Amino acid sequence: MTEIFHDSSISSNDVKILGLINNNRVEKYIDKKYVLPHENLMKYKVIIPKSNGSGSIGEVLSTPVIGLPVIGHTQSFISIGAYDSEYEANATLKYVKTKFARCMLGTLKVTQDNNPPTWANVPSQDFTSNSDIDWSKSISEIDKQLYEKYGLSEEEIAFIEEKIKPME
């Protein structure tokens, strides 16, 4: 029987797929003809595990990564964005690492399940260089910009800073 997935690319038509085998993150390759079309397959995106932590507010996300064009993933992951530029994907990665975004995620994420509906309270952003947020800054500096943008009180900021673990 012919193998569908391979440990290394064997053709220019191959797509890299991020998945899990025995709870370990793996990369395999598959011919593009076996992959259903998706809006972000040929775009930059951020890939995050669909299952993460226990649901406690403030948890760090388990190793989010930038997905380059021609990288897909199994249903063990979710992806955010479909960008033409790596800059936008990097800005998105910084955003999901902010305390602000993860606090908003924590308002709906009460289990380890990190499915798309749990992100509903995380405000969408402009991740281009024209954004009102300077994405070239550090994550903590981006948090400060987000606190100001959304008019958070000193009490709200103190709560986030105390309860949400930092990510770099």
Positions of PLM-derived features:
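Short acidic, low-complexity intrinsically disordered linear motifs used
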Residues: 145-157
